[in-house]
Curated annotation (Swiss-Prot):
Gene Ontology BP, a term: actin filament bundle assembly
Entries under InterPro entries matching the protein: Znf_LIM (IPR001781)
Compositionally biased intervals (Basic and acidic residues): 191-209
Species name: Arabidopsis thaliana
Protein name: LIM domain-containing protein PLIM2a
LIM zinc-binding domain sequence ranges: 8-68, 104-164
Region called Disordered, residue ranges: 173-226
GO molecular function: actin filament binding; metal ion binding
Keyword Repeat: yes
Length: 226
């Protein structure tokens, strides 16, 4: 079996990678055997890796080195002292100057976002778990999201809610109505059309009912004595 013409190079060892041994992540190519944590050399899989400036880590060591204190300069120095390696020796000054004291906040939940869990879209930062469709809650990706006034949607529901109607006015109006309903604290009072008619509760006198009374007022006929 030959793989003539392949030019893919492993990001870790810079050697040719053939299809049978290929892993592609974040636009970079790796041998499966080279896809390892820089800190502990443990083998990584797609579900348990993290990266910083192209350097690979398992999630436990990434959190230990970067996330716990929020100060990347301190964590890099601690990592280098505990277990020196080529990547940490070359890169701490660049990373620490860029990430020291990060104050990025998630546009959805307003909490701090660390690089391990950050998605950046249209100048806003999000936790990966917060980057979801507002309508259905489904996870979004760079290629599947749409937004209106900073509100996130999947493209399917964006098309369903907005594009099919050809106007956004009904969306803004629905939001305004919802806010007014919430501030009123309950249902609105009934209109005049639904108020009971006071006169309807007074029954009208019937002719049959009035007849006995009228008959009682007639003078009795005289009695004829024999």
């Amino acid at each position: 079996m030959s793989f003539t013409g392949t030019l893919d190079k492993c990001k870790a060892c810079d050697k040719t990678v053939y299809v049978m041994d290929l892993l592609t992540l974040e636009g970079n190519t790796y041998h499966k055997s080279c896809f390892r944590c820089t800190h502990c050399k443990g083998t990584l899989v797609i579900s348990n890796y993290s990266s910083m400036d192209g350097v690979l880590y398992c999630k436990p060591h990434f959190e230990q080195l970067f996330k716990e204190s929020g100060n990347y300069s301190k964590n890099f120095q601690a990592g280098k002292t505990e277990k020196p390696n080529d990547h940490l020796t070359r890169t701490p000054s660049k990373l620490s100057s860029f990430f020291s004291g990060t104050q990025d906040k998630c546009a959805t939940c307003k909490k701090t976002v660390y690089p391990l869990e950050k998605v950046t879209m249209e100048g806003e930062s999000y936790h990966k778990t917060c980057f979801r469709c507002t309508h259905s809650g489904c996870p979004l990706t760079h290629s599947s999201y749409a937004s209106l006034n900073g509100v996130l949607y999947c493209k399917v529901h964006f098309n369903q809610l907005f594009l099919e109607k050809g106007s956004y006015n009904h969306v803004h109006q629905a939001a305004a109505n919802h806010r007014r309903s919430a501030s009123s604290g309950g249902a609105s009072p009934p209109s005049d059309d639904h108020k009971p008619d006071d006169t309807a509760s007074i029954p009208e006198a019937k002719e049959d009912d009035a007849a006995p009374e009228a008959a009682g007022e007639e003078e009795p006929e005289p009695v004829v004595e024999s």
